[in-house]
């Protein structure tokens, strides 16, 4: 069994964290020789701008089973007309990666004390933010300030776009027994696009998934619930592109470090565990961080999501998650988690644990 993975390290810590994820994937191959991973590296972000003048060269492969991304951006490239982040927007749009999945939970309960929330409020937090990724205000019509002191952006959604992301949320909810509740976040009291969103989500669940429940929350009240009692949102949280961008970042601090949280961006339902997807940590490129200090766990867990959702290697993906728990519980941690271990030491420990679990 051979799997083709495009690796886009990106900028700054991107190379370090993708190297550790590759190390863990290679450990799977060592434990299970029938599983082979072929890695093809390409540039993205600032590294691509420096080398080619554009943030995502056209030769980046679209024929892989999945894409593993490190991180893009940094102060060197600023906010000019050519920016590293444009590479991310381009690859999402070109590859049709319409659904961004960001789990919010604790990789280990031993990390509860690191949360900014009191342990009694944070314990048990377990939800997935499902963010619509290729529509809305980030891709709408806009006007820059051309000297007249006026600029604007437009938010546009269609019924098919909202139906598609709703079906993704419903699919994920139905993977559990009993099915998970769905929370839909919008601003329907103000925005026309949110009123269409709410109506379409409601009708899609009612007509296609009557066994599921959906509750609607205004995005501002959901933001308050998230810091006051995050377990109330346990289940599947579905929202549009901009709201999802913001609320998932808010959620990411609950487990105590951005270095822990993975993400997946999918082009189709993972109903056969073979959806094409791009996998990346939730954190940025950390340009100020010294070498070998970044936490690789988020990228390693992103690789675990890739194994389960795109590569049809569910058992191996769960083994990676279990290995991460064991390593964290053993006290092997980077500085962001109060430890003193290096990036490579954490990666080595997870790779070793994976081989032991799969032996």
Curated annotation (Swiss-Prot):
GO biological process, one term: L-leucine biosynthetic process
Site label Important for catalysis, positions: 138, 187
Keyword DNA repair: no
Binding of substrate, residues: 92, 102, 131, 220
GO terms, molecular function: 3-isopropylmalate dehydrogenase activity; magnesium ion binding; NAD binding
Pathway(s) it belongs to: Amino-acid biosynthesis; L-leucine biosynthesis; L-leucine from 3-methyl-2-oxobutanoate: step 3/4
PROSITE patterns referenced in this protein's UniProt entry, alphabetically: IDH_IMDH (PS00470)
Residues that, per the record, bind Mg(2+): 220, 245, 249
Reactions the enzyme catalyzes: (2R,3S)-3-isopropylmalate + NAD(+) = 4-methyl-2-oxopentanoate + CO2 + NADH
Main location: cytoplasm
Co-factor requirement: Mg(2+); Mn(2+)
Similarity comment: Belongs to the isocitrate and isopropylmalate dehydrogenases family.
SUBUNIT field: Homodimer.
Record-given protein name: 3-isopropylmalate dehydrogenase
